[in-house]
Amino acid sequence: MTKKITVIPGDGIGKEITEAAVAVLKKADGKFGLSLEYDYHDAGGTAYDKFGTPLPEETLAAAKASDGVLFGAVGGDKWDSVEPTLRPEKAILGLRKGLGLYANLRPVKVADALVQYSPLKPELVKGVDLVIVRELIGGIYFGDRCESEMKDGAERAWDLENYSVPEVDRIARLAFETAKLRRGKVTSVDKSNVLATSRLWRRTVEKVHEDYKDVTLDHLYVDNCAMQLAVRPTQFDVICTGNLFGDILSDEAAVIGGSIGMMTSASIGEQTSLFEPIHGSAPDIAGKGIANPIGTILSAALLLRYSLKEEKAAAAVEAACDKALADGFRTPDLWTEGFKKANTESMTQAILDRL
């Protein structure tokens, strides 16, 4: 049966990097018989220029009807003066809401060939391969709030942290299912020594664990987890945590790899999921053909794994990326003397040749 992929290039380098990822998907399709077809739509500043909105209804409808969404990047200086509600970045927020994307998966894997680029010591980084599973639509970011009120003669503001058992149950099950595809370990991160919501979080995760006895579970307080990511990141397999903690830990973990051009993410929904690199639209290099496509190509691998359940194809794409790097190919963001200088096209070709 044919699987439909909605491709949303977006702005800046988005077109170049999504073209690279689609080329790799097509090669994987030919190798593994995936029967993929592609449907292209606008979002971000490009859509605003054409339609007066960063997320046209047609784009959202196409995304909802697809088997997976491959997203490039949005934004740029060109749209800095646009009304805030119409800024390019509103496109991704609208897609998250419209698709009901409840979890964000942030893989952090450091290829042996890239250990030297990490700010951490090589002996700490070698072998890092973890995934942060972050709850995306609950918690303090979506709770009640007050910007300003007077109480006891002082101005104050407040935000409400709120989690329900079903919300935690859903994200915990995703974390355990993810661990089953990997090394079989989940670390649940909370602040249960202080926060009531974290105590509910921990109780619920432990209850869900009863259905996943083949997966190991441990718990860390968020402050300790932040330290452990810097001290011994190889200890982690799957980290499961709430929205606020996950936001912070994901950005900390992203630094471990040494290049934002390599980083990818998956936003998981009940029906359709969205896959994108974590870097921006880089308008300063748009059209120059020098953007690193690997983050987007690895996003396509996540699409194969999580939306299409094509694990062999996903692993083959990831292995091809690792092999191209091991053979010395480097885009300008990673190039140093002694390596093979590559642009977007030649790096993509190097990966295709190894798939």
Per-region residue spans from a language model:
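Buried hydrophobic packing segments
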Residues: 21, 25, 205, 296-307, ...
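Glycine-rich phosphate/diphosphate-binding loop of Rossmann-like nucleotide-binding domains
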Residues: 6-23, 28-29, 152-223, 235
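Glycine-rich phosphate/nucleotide-binding loop
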Residues: 45-47, 229-329
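Extreme N-terminal starter segment of soluble prokaryotic enzymes
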Residues: 1-5
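N-terminal beta-loop-helix "entrance" segment that forms/cooperates
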Residues: 33-57, 227-229
